[in-house]
């Protein structure tokens, strides 16, 4: 991998590809003319946000995510390593396009890092591995059209998995009321609280 840690590997990578149209709708600011030119010439070493996101969703660890609210659109993205959710908030245009319902099942792809202390918005669960202190979730359904792989992963997570994520999300709303991260992929690793 060019942008992510080669010394650790995701146990549940689903190898999805990005859909540039979906990604552009979600985060148009990374599609400036210069960024698009760099992306076309990536094999010569040019780095772009598009390429970083592409690698993230192809090789990262896939887990369940669930729609918590629709106004504003809140999606809880689960990660197994810290055994917690990250609450992501999205612009109204995302809800208008996809017309999500509360408890709709999605898939997120996570990458991790170790920083000096656990990110302040995380509530580590009893199965926290203790390996990581930063999680970077991206909602697969919003950046990829690999529907077969995404649906297969949803089926693997199953009812029990999504029920667990829903419970974590419900608990989170009580303990971290009104706190979420920006859902756009280039910001979703950062604790920049968005209050709803």
Predicted features and spans:
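N-terminal intrinsically disordered, low-complexity, charge/repeat-rich segments that act as generic
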Residues: 1-45, 190-196
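Structural detector for short beta-strands of small beta-barrel domains
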Residues: 55-73, 107
